[in-house]
């Protein structure tokens, strides 16, 4: 697949081949500053723009949680839960009580796969948690 990069300030047109897997849909809930967001990029290349603190790195961290390990910031699972809660909105209070989750629909060689991960609290105090991983809706056991 070819991607055309256009930079308006430099009048630069570049065509590049994209051979790797493409994220067709990203869904995030209760992750850092996001209560719920779903993105479906229409292009094969995406640039995230925004002010400091807008959540650009949080989206990248959410994607990084789909690989083995603790993500790009190496945070504890319980630290990834949404931090700010609007206590005037009952739906937000209920949603904030749930743990974080990240899901992507990935396309590679014409095939689509859904990969998801999230956190499940394992103690009443909410401080202990385990990570769950699903591929195409099936829970994957750790190796």
Language-model segments: which ranges?
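Intrinsically disordered, low-complexity segments used for protein-protein interactions
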Residues: 1, 5-8, 116-117, 138
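Pre-Walker A-like glycine/lysine-rich segment at the N-terminus of P-loop NTPase domains
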Residues: 2-65, 86
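Nucleotide-state sensing region of NTPase/ATPase domains
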Residues: 68-143
